[in-house]
């Protein structure tokens, strides 16, 4: 039996709280102005029309509308279709 704990065991035993990242509103779903669409670390998804970016890279709706996801040249963008809105 060792009297010392060993190098590995003292460095274990931590766990961080989950950050609740990810897509909050999916494609063709309605969102109100100011509603959060995606929480992310870095610009994995780029903002399109009527979508703003927060200081923590959160994408949010500038107007109410339907969420549209598009991928052009390997870049994923999120935009809002404000023409047909029924919220």
From Swiss-Prot:
Family affiliation: Belongs to the bacterial ribosomal protein bL27 family.
Keyword Cytoplasm: no
GO molecular function, one term: structural constituent of ribosome
Keyword list, A-Z: Chloroplast, Plastid, Ribonucleoprotein, Ribosomal protein
Protein known as: Large ribosomal subunit protein bL27c
UniProt cross-references to HAMAP family, sorted A to Z: Ribosomal_bL27
Cellular component terms per the entry's GO annotation: chloroplast; ribonucleoprotein complex; ribosome
Native species: Emiliania huxleyi (Coccolithophore)
Any one of the GO BP annotations: translation
Start and end residues of each stretch annotated as Disordered: 1-21
Entries under PANTHER family matching the protein: LARGE RIBOSOMAL SUBUNIT PROTEIN BL27M, RIBOSOMAL PROTEIN L27
Listed Pfam families: Ribosomal_L27 (PF01016)
Domain of life: Eukaryota
SUPFAM superfamilies recorded: Ribosomal L27 protein-like
Chief localization: plastid
Localisation per UniProt entry: Plastid, Chloroplast
Keyword presence, 4Fe-4S: no
